[in-house]
Amino acid sequence: MAASEVAGLGAGTPSPSESSALCASKSDESLPDGLSPKDSAQKQKNLSPPSVSSQMITKESNRNAHLEHPEQNPGSSVGDTSAAHEEVVGENLVATALCLSGNGSQSDLKDLTNPAGEEGDTSLRESLHPVTRSLKAGCHSKQLASGNCSEEKCPAASVLKEGSRDAGLDLLPVVPPANGVEGVRVDQDDDQDSSSLKLSQNIAVQTDFKTADSEVNTDQDIEKNLDKMMTERTLLKERYQEVLDKQRQVESQLQVQLKQLQQRREEEMKNHQEILKAIQDVTIKREETKKKIEKEKKEFLQKEQDLKAEIEKLCEKGRREVWEMELDRLKNQDGEINRNIMEETERAWKAEILSLESRKELLVLKLEEAEKEAELHLTYLKSTPPTLETVRSKQEWETRLNGVRIMKKNVRDQFNSHIQLVRNGAKLSSLPQIPTPTLPPPPSEADFMLQVFQPSPSLTPRMPFSIGQVTMPMVMPSADPRSLSFPILNPALSQSSQPSPPLPGSHGRNSPGLGSLVSPHGPHMPPAASIPPPPGLGGIKASSETPRPQPVDKLEKILEKLLTRFPQCNKAQMTNILQQIKTARTTMAGLTMEELIQLVAARLAEHERVASSTQAPPTCKLCLMCQKLVQPSELHPMACTHALHKECIKFWAQTNTNDTCPFCPTLK
């Protein structure tokens, strides 16, 4: 009866072999090495009835052995019922756990056994840990109880035990330690259990076969053990159900957390992508900025080089402009110097021409005087009755007149040719000097000629001004003074006074100085009334007329009246003013005293106005040598009023021992 109950219980509860056979198709890892799923299923089918009986026999023999030898196994003296109950419960739990995978909870167990699972399965692992420990203890006691059972007689049971053990070991969850120490200890316990199981397997294989022949009584305390087993089974089912409920709750919580974590992960990934994109944008922007900076740097360098080149060009241009300005200045200076040279050359050329013309005029003037003298004599001789002596004198004077005219023409031709050569560019010093013509002595005059030309004291004309007051043309200082000095043409003419140029007011009037052209040669002269006047001398009357008043006395009276009217002027200033008035009017004839006084007053007022306007620096005079303005610092001090440069008078001052002025004999 007990055997039947055990068999019924064994048939009602799934055995480890059946559970392993059901789960063999799900996982191939729980099978032993060298067995395929088909082979294990076939063996389990063939060996299932004997396995139950062999298990029951083994249990009964183990129980009897423990009862008979309590001292030999003190560790297994807890009781056969407890050992058998634990073994059956462990096998049922293993089978139930293996069968859960076939009922659709394989994913849940995989999640529980996965060591890299979520953090929320800690409570499930803690609740399953004592169950797995109890399963390990039951399996260990079962191996110790069936140690005398040979592997040859119970091959299916050993295979199922090993499969259930392997499946139980594979299903053990890895509990992460709270502090890193407990996990290490649990792993060490698991390693020790697995090593003890392996050792027990090896010992079970190497056990003597004679122990399998022992007999065990299985009828003792069966019902009590079955009741306990059923109670434990119910409790385990309830605990298992609680564990499943907790697992579902934890799974739901884990799903929520997983969704939150996934959402957070997505957000983090999105943020990460955005950050990566921002980093990429910043990197691109940095590269672009770097390229832009390099480009700008190159542009700046190029611009700097261009600016340097432009600066060099500008500097070169500035230097060139300075050189051009200096060149222009030098050109202007050279042009000015050339102009000055041309002006000086032209001035010297004009001075040379003026010198030649002055000398020509002087020589021609002397020859014209001789010509007029000859004409005068011929005119008188023609008016006299012809006699042998007068004819001879007339011939001599005609010969002299022709010679003088020829000589005058030659002098003019020579001087004109020299003037033309000088105008063409020849130097005066390089031209041959024109000799001064020498007149032959005049023919001797007869006694009647001497009587005719003997002037009467009562008829001696007086000049309105003294001869010394008449100024001759000024000779340029550059001319040779020696070339301007002429010898006296005729000794007879030298005794007579030189004719002065007629005054502007005397044009058309009778010349009062014709009687002074010829000086008397004899002390006796006939009366002028007995000599008829020559026909060409109209205006000279030999009648006895009252003599004119002397012009000098009249000029003195005019000066005295003017000095009385203008006491601020002296005699020299008044004479100068009268000369200016005469130069401006070309004549003083026909002026009344009142008109003359008005002209003098106007001239004095003009002088005062000019003096007041040019009061600042004194007017510079012209140098008589170079005809340039003489500055006060360059003026050579002299006793006279002549102005000369120090450099111009330097050679004269060194060579002249008397240190006199070259234009006047006044000493310093």
Swiss-Prot record:
The keyword Protein transport does not apply. The modification Phosphoserine is found at S15, S40, S48, S54, S196, S497, S511, S516. Residues 1-87, 103-125, 486-552 are annotated as: Disordered. One of its GO terms (molecular function) is zinc ion binding. A zinc finger (RING-type) spans 623-665. The modification N-acetylalanine is found at A2. Residues 523-536 have a biased composition (Pro residues). Residues 220-379 form a coiled coil. Residues 43-59 have a biased composition (Polar residues). It holds the Pfam family TTC3. Keywords: Acetylation, Coiled coil, Metal-binding, Phosphoprotein, Zinc, Zinc-finger. PANTHER family: RING FINGER PROTEIN 214. This is RING finger protein 214. The gene is Rnf214.
